[in-house]
Amino acid sequence: LFEAGKDLDVRAGCPNLIERIEAGLLSYGNDMSIDDTPFESGLGKYCNLDTATGCLGHAALMHKQNPGRQIRPLAVAGPAVPPITWSWPLTNTAGDTAGHVSSITWSPDFEINVAIGMVHKDHWTAGTTLHVQTPDGPRAAEVRDSFWI
């Protein structure tokens, strides 16, 4: 492939940060890790537990198929946020823990901060307003039903 595209300067690449978050492309080690189940990471649609009965992890997956938290897209209000270097806490309007934001950036196309967060079940309904604790102070974060692109 690279040889065929040499005249076009074809080379290995990946989406930029903005596109990755807008599209909901998860970053292993950042948005999900070995500690997260496929169901928490939004990959449950690829786990057919009815046909995978011989799978080594079948019993564990059966036990975890209704997660208490899950990856959700979040629209965060205000001007561009500073770079994220660690997860930022999410709270509900009463100040109770609601999850965390793992990836966030300003989207010039959508004119809002686009984010990926691990949100607790009680707070993941689209339209729910949460608060993300940024280095610049708390910001309103609305849970969305889908990613932007």
Task: Kindly give the residue locations of the regions a language model identified.
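Conserved, structured C-terminal
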Residues: 1-149
